[in-house]
Amino acid sequence: MKLPLKALVPLLAVAALAAACNPFTPWNWPTADPTPYPQDPRFAEFKYETDDKLEVQERVDSFNERIPKLGATDGHVLVAHFRDGASWQPTPDRQFWLTGVAEVPDTTITMLVDESIGESSLLPGIHPLLYTYVPEDCSFTTVDPAVANKVLGTDPGAIYSEWGSFEIREFAVSADCNLIIVTGDGLNA
């Protein structure tokens, strides 16, 4: 049976359209290049992600309210919500992460140095936008996160407070520069 040319053309058109709409055909869409952040071998990898717009803020309340016994006198911080689909789906509680560098008084340094683990080969993973706030001539000591949480009075259960709960995940202290580097997360109800 021979198909006339008039019947063959519509079949080819349908086949071409169906092939173009095939969901199983791999697409080579150009992907957006990630923002080129500075690289610094002093720091561990920063693992938190967000869809929020990031902006370094110069403030101490973000540190001192979440870490009550820190006593920060100056600081630079990034706070953002986790990438959790909350923009398209309501979530009653929003999990956030915080990373920052803060100046602290000698009393805070003394409390933490007594409980330190020792010299660190890599500094805690902080967001690359904060690298410039960590002078290269400062030496840091790692503090166990469980010890830092206990000594500094963080409250991982305070989700209903104004600032939410907070738990330190990585922490280092510099006695010669009176700086701390912190990364942690919490929950806002």
Q: Where are these predicted regions, by residue range?
A:
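Mixed-charge, polar/low-complexity N-terminal
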Residues: 2-3, 48, 52-53, 57-58, ...
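C-terminal motif of bacterial Sec signal peptides marking the signal peptidase cleavage site
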Residues: 17-20
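Mature extracytoplasmic domains of secretory-pathway proteins
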Residues: 69-150
